[in-house]
């Protein structure tokens, strides 16, 4: 592990200047690997890499009587979401006390975060906050409360925020954004208190202290009061929602909560799978906190019909749920450029069939299936290559799978404008998501962008992907590389789906159109 120089580290704010994976590895694995007995260090590294299966497998190799095992078991239990059991195990550890103390601190932090409830106690369905009358003499002023943002994080979540606020500005809404307390300094970046990205104002709540929810809510209320906002609009997760709710109730403002995903289910898919993780303390608490914020909101926005159904199953009244699906900016509907010319421009062989994904690289995306499908298709005689454009926590895993011949390439993170170039260079865009509760419910942004560029989309056959594409795609069973390889051989037979998909996006998925729903939702909160 390469460490940064101390002067640079101190100048950038100590450990906050490191990326999150770097900080975790320094915290969990630094100095713990014993070359004579590497097993404890390997367990620490598995925990640092968020690899529960590997951590549990290695832990099982340790003798029960090994005095080092309790602290390691505590770390693995914490990773598995069993917060109380982890803390108990850590307190019983007689060796590895530094590791045990880290577990206890982290368990306390999680318990504080997951134990928080909206001010005034848990909201009952239908309970509302009295709000002040809206101002009639000037444009509606909305403050969006988000977890992360451009330019520091580029993902579907941050691109959606940028697109929504840009559209609202053109519609006469005075919309601004504030990011979570401590962002982006806690992620290792230095930032001003306000940054502007293409006319969108991002306020930063910088803090040298931890992101306590009550402190977050108080700082948020101060900013909202200073900006004289009319509506507080928070987006996933419950920490944002809880803080915005504190501020809204303090100021008498309407509170809108936008459910962009189910983060507890995303976590579950990485930590033992849906069935096992759903019974853990962390999952249950996170789901309860999310539900409480949904029930307390004056209006709830979400992305898809399946997600709306899930909200209703939690007790949210259907007439308070508003759908704002993912859309595309107008430049995605510019004329499509010649694919052969774009292949040359992007360094790809123009005669070869090129497919790929433009995505954040998470395990949910199922990219190993794409790599294997290309291998199978090439073994069957198809001259096909794949490009993976993006970055993320699963990138190292994907890189290990890439062949040495350059037929599958991982490009890394690119600017949004370059993402459009890559779409135009591909013959088909593949969305090989795994089958899990979260992928069945949550609709991603990237397939809509691909259709806007008239690209054939080949996607896992999941309800969320059928809705996200309007059915204008080819569908294969998740995790079935052989079936995907067969679809790759038939790309030329189905290019018309991309053309039809572009027409559908033009009609129904422009940001400037889908974002008009927000005005109706805001107006509804003012009438409560």
Q: Across the structure, where does each feature detected by a protein language model lie?
A:
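Nucleotide-sugar-dependent
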Residues: 365, 415-421, 431-447, 459-467
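N-terminal subdomain of nucleotide-sugar transferases
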Residues: 1-37, 107-201
């Amino acid at each position: 592990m390469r460490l940064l120089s101390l002067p640079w580290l101190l100048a950038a704010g100590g450990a906050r200047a490191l990326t999150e994976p770097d900080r975790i590895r320094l915290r969990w694995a630094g100095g713990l690997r014993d070359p004579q007995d590497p097993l404890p260090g390997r367990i620490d590294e598995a925990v640092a890499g968020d690899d529960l299966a590997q951590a549990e497998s290695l832990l099982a190799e340790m003798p029960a009587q090994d005095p080092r095992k309790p602290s390691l078991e505590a770390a693995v239990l914490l990773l598995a979401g069993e917060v109380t059991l982890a803390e108990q195990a850590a307190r019983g550890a007689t060796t590895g006390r530094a590791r045990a103390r880290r577990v206890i601190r982290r368990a306390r932090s999680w318990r504080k975060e997951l134990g928080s409830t909206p001010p005034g106690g848990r909201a009952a369905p239908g309970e509302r906050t009295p709000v002040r009358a809206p101002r009639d003499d000037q444009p509606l002023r909305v403050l969006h409360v988000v977890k992360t943002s451009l330019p520091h994080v580029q993902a579907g979540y941050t691109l959606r925020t940028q697109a929504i606020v840009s559209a609202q500005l053109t519609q006469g809404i005075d919309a601004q954004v504030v990011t979570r307390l401590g962002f982006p300094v806690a992620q290792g970046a230095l930032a001003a208190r306000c940054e502007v990205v293409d006319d969108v104002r991002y306020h930063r709540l910088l803090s040298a202290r931890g992101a306590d929810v009550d402190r977050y809510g108080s700082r948020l209320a101060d900013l909202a009061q200073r900006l004289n906002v009319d509506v507080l609009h928070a987006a996933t997760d419950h920490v944002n929602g809880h803080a915005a709710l504190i501020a809204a109730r303090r100021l008498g403002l309407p509170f809108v909560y936008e459910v962009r995903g189910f983060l507890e289910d995303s976590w579950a898919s990485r930590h033992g799978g849906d069935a096992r993780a759903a019974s853990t303390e962390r999952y249950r608490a996170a789901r309860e906190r999310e539900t409480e914020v949904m029930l307390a909101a004056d209006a709830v926005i979400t992305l898809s019909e399946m997600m709306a159904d899930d909200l209703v199953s939690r007790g949210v009244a259907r007439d308070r749920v508003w759908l704002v699906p993912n859309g595309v900016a107008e430049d995605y509907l510019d004329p499509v450029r010649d694919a052969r010319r774009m292949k040359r421009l992007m360094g790809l062989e123009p005669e070869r069939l090129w497919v790929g994904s433009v995505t954040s690289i998470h395990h949910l995306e199922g990219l190993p299936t794409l790599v294997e499908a290309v291998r199978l298709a090439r073994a069957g005689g198809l001259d096909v290559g794949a490009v993976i454009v993006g970055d993320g926590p699963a990138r190292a895993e994907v890189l290990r799978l890439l062949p040495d011949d350059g037929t599958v390439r991982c490009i890394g993170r690119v600017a949004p404008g370059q993402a459009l170039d890559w779409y135009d260079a591909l013959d088909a865009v593949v969305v090989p998501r795994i089958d899990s509760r979260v992928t069945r419910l949550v609709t991603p942004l990237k397939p809509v962008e691909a259709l806007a560029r008239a690209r054939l989309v080949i996607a896992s056959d999941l309800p969320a992907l059928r809705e996200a594409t309007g059915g204008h795609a080819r569908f294969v069973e998740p995790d079935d590389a052989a079936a995907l390889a067969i679809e790759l051989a038939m790309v030329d037979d189905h290019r018309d789906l991309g053309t039809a998909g572009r027409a559908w996006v033009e009609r129904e998925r422009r940001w400037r159109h889908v974002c008009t729903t927000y005005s109706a939702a805001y107006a509804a909160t003012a009438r409560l």
